[in-house]
Regions:
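Conserved catalytic-core motifs of GNAT/GCN5-like acyltransferases
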Residues: 62, 105-109, 125-139, 278-289
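Amide-forming acyltransferase catalytic core, primarily the GNAT-like/NAT-type
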Residues: 123-223
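Active-site rim helix/loop that mediates acceptor-substrate recognition in acyltransferases
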Residues: 11, 20-59, 177-210
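Conserved acetyl-CoA-binding loop-helix of GNAT-fold acetyltransferases
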Residues: 75, 81-94, 98, 117, ...
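Conserved beta-strand in the GNAT
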Residues: 47, 53-61, 69, 74, ...
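A conserved beta-turn-beta hairpin within the catalytic core of GNAT-like acetyltransferases
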Residues: 62-70, 80, 220-230, 279-282
């Protein structure tokens, strides 16, 4: 029996939360996210119904006038590998095209072979490899020898850049190894990506979120307990100095953790490993619409 695909309603959230609370070892975020997704004008949430019961859910959101993001696909444990996900995906693509999207992207964790295989079956192509990395601030922080164990700021720090410097930041990244590996993408709210624009850098500078210094450039976002770095531009020889400066910046802001989202360029991943970051590989998929 083919499932009925329809737009989700607020009343569906309770049913969905009942079979998604233990999707992963740590649980699942989907039940908490659905109310916000349902309320957004730039997003759609679709469900698959069989005999009146919701057995699948998936969502898409417009991140720019031409870029859509697929997210939150979940299938009831009793109905997996029965084509429910294959039925939801085309309906999401129809919605995205109607909004003006020319591409749909998604993110899959490296370990999730089932989701990666499903992406390929749906006509997506793997376009980039990224990593999500984090470490506690204070643990293994830069401590020069002979100072009695006290942290001191690194010699090469980062300062807030002026919005007039945004063009220079973009130029330092454009056409380089990091831009190519990233496929020109910028993480939005950590777990979504769209093309980086000059306005992203200039607007960040206006709120002191664009940093610069001899090691390079970085975007930062303040979270309650962490400093997030969704974008940086540096050379291989400066990767260590850049990460050290970001650790210091997070410590100075009183954060407990530094988190970065970067393309999986080998020398940058190696620099993260040398500084005790916990690294989680990610795959980015894209499909023309």
């Amino acid at each position: 029996m083919e499932p009925v695909i329809r737009v989700a309603r607020d009343a569906d959230v309770t049913a969905i939360s009942g079979w998604t609370h233990d999707t992963f070892e740590w649980g699942d975020y989907i039940a908490d996210a659905l109310p916000d997704w349902l309320a957004r004008d730039d997003a759609v949430v679709l469900v698959a119904e069989l005999d009146g019961a919701v057995v699948g859910v998936s969502s898409s959101r417009m991140l720019s006038p031409t870029e859509a993001w697929a997210q939150g696909t979940r299938i009831h444990p009793d109905h997996r590998r029965q084509g429910v996900g294959m039925s939801l995906a085309p309906a999401l693509e129809v919605w995205a095209r109607e909004q003006g999207a020319r591409v749909m992207r998604s993110m899959v964790e490296d370990w999730n072979e089932a989701a990666r295989s499903q992406s390929l079956k749906l006509g997506y192509r793997e376009v980039a490899a990224w990593v999500r990395a984090g470490r506690a601030v204070g643990e293994n922080s830069p401590v020069p020898e002979g100072n009695g164990g006290r942290r001191v700021p690194p010699a090469e720090g980062l300062r807030p850049a002026h919005s007039s410097e945004a063009a220079s930041a973009l130029m330092s990244w454009s056409g380089g190894e990091l831009e190519r590996a990233a496929r020109g993408l910028l993480p939005i709210e950590v777990w979504r990506m769209r093309r980086l624009t000059p306005a992203d850098l200039s607007e960040a500078a206006k709120r002191n979120g664009l940093l610069t210094g001899r090691p390079g450039w970085a975007l930062i976002e303040q979270r309650d307990d962490a400093l997030e770095v969704p974008w940086l531009a540096c050379e291989e020889t400066d990767a260590g100095a850049m990460l050290r400066a970001l650790v210091d910046r997070a410590a100075a802001a009183g954060k407990e953790e530094l988190r970065v989202m970067i393309p999986a360029v080998p020398w940058l991943v190696a620099a993260l490993e040398r500084r005790s970051f916990e690294i989680h590989p990610l795959r980015i998929y894209a499909k023309p619409l």
